[in-house]
Amino acid sequence: MRLARELLGGTLVRVTPDGHRLSGRVVEVEAYDCPRDPACTAGRFHAARSAEMAIAPGHWLFWFAHGHPLLQVACRQEGVSASVLIRALEPLEGAGKMLDYRPVTRQRDLTSGPAKLVYALGLDPMQISHRPVNSPELHLLAPETPLADDEVTVTARVGIREGRNLPWRFLIRGNGWVSPAQPSMELAAP
């Protein structure tokens, strides 16, 4: 859970194959911690998915939900399926190029959801998955200043049935780029 909280306010930077720099501030994340997490499906359905999720910490991985790719950071020792899902970004650089990848009529819809941000950054899961989070083409920069507790909201997770009431969704309070998904409740930090 600590990594999920620490990613908030950081910058996700994408350098496209044609040299464009796209970046966004991480404004929403969710943690998943198998095997104790009832929402974690890695291993419940088939071994290939479990192996995909159980990579070394500090590497990118993609999970597909309803056919859409979701960007995650592996965060436990190799062999254990645990990750942080990046749910939303506030665009900082390259919004025009992001719109080329993901045309939208409302700018807020560009990166305010986990699949939306993958499409807006033009990410190819086959090219990025299992690469270190400090790869030149996609990397994370730590926040210049860690967020204060009063700047962070902790809620129940969204878009899942089991384990949704765990306090593992973190977002920057009042940020307009947070996904529109509504949790069932705001919770105390873990």
Swiss-Prot record:
UniProt lineage: Bacteria, Thermotogati, Deinococcota, Deinococci, Deinococcales
Family: Belongs to the DNA glycosylase MPG family.
Protein's recorded name: Putative 3-methyladenine DNA glycosylase
Record's keyword annotation contains Disulfide bond: no
Protein species of origin: Deinococcus radiodurans (strain ATCC 13939 / DSM 20539 / JCM 16871 / CCUG 27074 / LMG 4051 / NBRC 15346 / NCIMB 9279 / VKM B-1422 / R1)
Pfam families, per database record: Pur_DNA_glyco (PF02245)
InterPro entries: Formyl_transferase-like_C_sf (IPR011034), MPG (IPR003180), MPG_sf (IPR036995)
Highest taxon in the source lineage: Bacteria
GO MF entries: alkylbase DNA N-glycosylase activity; DNA binding
PANTHER family associated with the record: DNA-3-METHYLADENINE GLYCOSYLASE
Record EC number: 3.2.2.-
